[in-house]
């Protein structure tokens, strides 16, 4: 039989075929795939800020996903994804980069958020860099940081997590690992300038990044808007970029602008109302895309409901008091006094 006869294996089938010739690597990669295939613990019945922030976000696709979750009575319902080992490695590397920057801020006494003790399961919420578990005394080096939960479920149905907060700077932090693929997706023109075919000028590409990418700014502004709704006193977000190819680091600071995220909040509000049957489902901004037509959510859409004409709350002025972050002794927590 001639070499190369038959269809070329692609995706996971190709990866499985390569694994047969390894001593250890193949077993590790199979383990990675099995772990990735386990049911996700990430809620799919809410709107994620990270999806809203993308330039090509399809509100209709988000609507369909949440509607399917409700019909199945399963908040974790998600179409099966065949993620390859290379992409799994990319995800893991991003997690490691997040962890090291968060732990540096923790060691400095600057990191605010939620901390878990794995020894006794004590939940430390709204703490600043605890040095030990309040319940069992476990040292902070063995505790786990669970970031900052951000919720705007009513009326926006939005829920997510910020990478951290630094009260002394009144700043949220967002940590981004940046590789050639990041730039290719986030700033195609910049990528094109420093690439030729498969060849990429990585040092030049990294040096040329002088502002945070638009999708990242969208995400950060959404986080800050939700902080205002929750009463958290953060007025800026600091982006920490780390280069995947040479571990270089950059910082970008973006001040809160309520006008920036208002259209996204309007879209989230419209999705929530459509899910309640109060208005029509959102239309696809791309006249059909993989998010709304390329995924089988197993749900149906009722059109022609019309709009109740109620304005989005994002157009109203937020009059809620803001809680300041202040010191309360050996372990600093979130204070309850209004700002200004």
Predicted segments, located by residue:
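A structural signal for short, well-ordered beta-strand segments and their strand-loop junctions
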Residues: 165, 171-175, 233-241
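Alpha-helix capping at helix-to-loop junctions
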Residues: 107, 178, 229-233
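Long, contiguous hydrophobic alpha-helical segments, chiefly transmembrane helices and signal peptides
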Residues: 158-162, 175, 216-222
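Metal-dependent nuclease catalytic cores that hydrolyze phosphodiester bonds in DNA/RNA
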Residues: 1-172, 179-199, 317-328, 334-337
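Metal-dependent nuclease catalytic regions and adjoining charged, substrate-binding loops involved
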Residues: 4, 10-17, 127, 185, ...
